[in-house]
């Protein structure tokens, strides 16, 4: 099992290119069963979850090739409507095949999903919405089995602005009969990117990026070429890397406009962030100071950056707090940061952080994707050596992270 060894205390300086968004690429690739023509998707990050998705698509009957950062998907000759447990158990996003399979075949049998163990992310919001379009579901032997005649348009109001639920319904409704209206829909840029992709393939979707989305069903979707948006979570992580090490990074292909909430909090802490012709320049100016953060759905502060900014708070002057409002049980990185010398106290869904002068390297263990990024950031700032175990979590969401960090001056190596 791979590990990362970091010798910290070195400022990072230089350019880093932000990769394509994992959270945008996954639903775009999982839309493969909807397509009837060859489709080329560019700027796809080479990640473990992407490879799992392409394996799943192949089992469903949608073959593809992955060269560089380009995926070429061929249309399915015969769709297999079953997503097996062996693949689905490793990746929660795989539940997104429900909508496309029901829309194309009238049947879907999908194992209950796995992925990061950061609390319940119930799929009932997906199922309830699809039922309003005419699908019926049973749960048997760990599988969700759905059936329908042709899906029909419906007016759906989500109880919560679910990202996965909105994406599933965008895909299902694209081939439904009639018009579907989604209220309280997720506004995340990755949801809008999926809608833009579907429109490029022939769908008729409007309102994406707002809380009310309208989808007019079409008989079929074709193919084409599309480029995935840059990864705003990766960009935020490297912004924090510049700040926590006291260096200056220049982020290329940075989705600056989608990072308002993160940029605002980092500036409040004393981080200088400037848009340039080449991207975004990030550096620390003087002492970092503590702030209070509450995670929110977009356009609020993203839960996927909660663990990373906590690492930064650990070395800031004064007190900080983070209230996690999206997921329960997403503070599993706290005990590992404490091993590095951080002072953190948890009360219910809020973490209270008192900044310390320096962190000290120690062996730590990653518990999930963003927790692993938090430990890398802390290790970059810590004195001495930090050994991070279970970095397979990191490989699910960050493309060649140690290589990118090495190129800007980090002393980091992968041990196999």
UniProtKB/Swiss-Prot annotation:
Record-level GO BP terms: cell division; cell wall organization; peptidoglycan biosynthetic process; regulation of cell shape; UDP-N-acetylgalactosamine biosynthetic process
Binding site for UDP-N-acetyl-alpha-D-glucosamine: 92, 304, 326
Pathway: Cell wall biogenesis; peptidoglycan biosynthesis
Enzyme Commission number(s) from the entry: 2.5.1.7
Subcellular location: Cytoplasm
Organism superkingdom: Bacteria
Modified residues (2-(S-cysteinyl)pyruvic acid O-phosphothioketal): 116
Catalytic activity, reaction form: phosphoenolpyruvate + UDP-N-acetyl-alpha-D-glucosamine = UDP-N-acetyl-3-O-(1-carboxyvinyl)-alpha-D-glucosamine + phosphate
Active site residues per record: 116
Example of a GO cellular component annotation carried by this entry: cytoplasm
Amino acids binding phosphoenolpyruvate: 22-23
Primary residence: cytoplasm
Record key words, sorted: Cell cycle, Cell division, Cell shape, Cell wall biogenesis/degradation, Cytoplasm, Peptidoglycan synthesis, Pyruvate, Transferase
Pfam family, one: EPSP_synthase
CDD domains listed in its UniProt record: UdpNAET (cd01555)
Keyword Zinc assigned: no
GO molecular-function terms, A-Z: UDP-N-acetylglucosamine 1-carboxyvinyltransferase activity
Function: Cell wall formation. Adds enolpyruvyl to UDP-N-acetylglucosamine.
Family: Belongs to the EPSP synthase family. MurA subfamily.
Listed name of the protein: UDP-N-acetylglucosamine 1-carboxyvinyltransferase
Native organism: Solidesulfovibrio magneticus (strain ATCC 700980 / DSM 13731 / RS-1) (Desulfovibrio magneticus)
Gene name tied to this protein: murA
């Amino acid at each position: 099992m791979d590990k990362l060894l970091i010798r910290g205390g070195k400022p990072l300086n230089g350019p880093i290119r932000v990769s394509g968004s994992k959270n945008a690429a996954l639903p775009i690739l999982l839309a493969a069963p909807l397509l009837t023509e060859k489709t080329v998707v560019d700027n796809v990050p080479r990640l473990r979850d992407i490879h799992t998705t392409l394996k799943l698509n192949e089992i469903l009957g949608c073959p593809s090739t992955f060269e560089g950062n380009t995926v070429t998907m061929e249309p399915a000759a015969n769709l297999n409507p079953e997503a097996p447990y062996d693949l689905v158990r490793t990746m929660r996003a795989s539940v997104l095949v429900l909508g496309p399979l029901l829309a194309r075949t009238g049947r879907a049998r999908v194992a209950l999903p796995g992925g990061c163990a950061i609390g319940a992310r119930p799929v009932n919001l997906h199922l309830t919405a699809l039922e309003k379009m005419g699908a019926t579901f049973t749960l048997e032997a760990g599988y969700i089995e759905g059936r329908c005649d042709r899906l029909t348009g419906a007016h759906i109001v989500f109880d919560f602005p679910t990202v996965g639920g909105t994406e599933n319904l965008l895909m299902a409704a694209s081939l439904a009969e009639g018009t579907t209206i989604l209220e309280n829909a997720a506004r995340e840029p990755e949801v809008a990117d999926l809608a833009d992709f579907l429109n490029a393939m022939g769908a008729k979707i409007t309102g994406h990026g707002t809380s009310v989305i309208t989808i007019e069903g079409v008989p079929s979707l074709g193919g084409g070429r599309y480029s995935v948006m840059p990864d705003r979570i990766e960009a935020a992580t490297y912004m924090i890397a510049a700040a926590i090490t006291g260096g200056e990074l220049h982020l290329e292909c940075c989705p600056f406009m989608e990072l308002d909430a993160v940029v605002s909090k980092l500036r409040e802490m004393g981080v200088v962030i400037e848009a340039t012709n080449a991207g975004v320049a990030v550096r620390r100016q003087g002492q970092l100071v503590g702030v209070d953060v509450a995670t929110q759905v977009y356009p609020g502060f993203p839960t996927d950056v909660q663990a990373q900014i906590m690492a930064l708070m650990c070395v800031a002057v004064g007190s900080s707090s983070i209230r996690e409002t999206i997921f329960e049980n997403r503070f599993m990185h706290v005990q590992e940061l404490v091993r590095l010398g951080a002072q953190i106290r948890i009360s219910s869904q809020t973490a209270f952080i008192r900044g310390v002068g320096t962190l000290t390297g120690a062996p730590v263990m990653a518990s999930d994707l963003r927790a692993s990024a938090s430990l890398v950031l802390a290790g970059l700032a810590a004195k001495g050596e930090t050994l991070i175990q279970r970095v397979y979590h990191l490989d699910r969401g960050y493309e060649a992270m140690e290589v990118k960090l090495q190129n800007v001056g980090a002393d980091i190596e992968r041990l196999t």
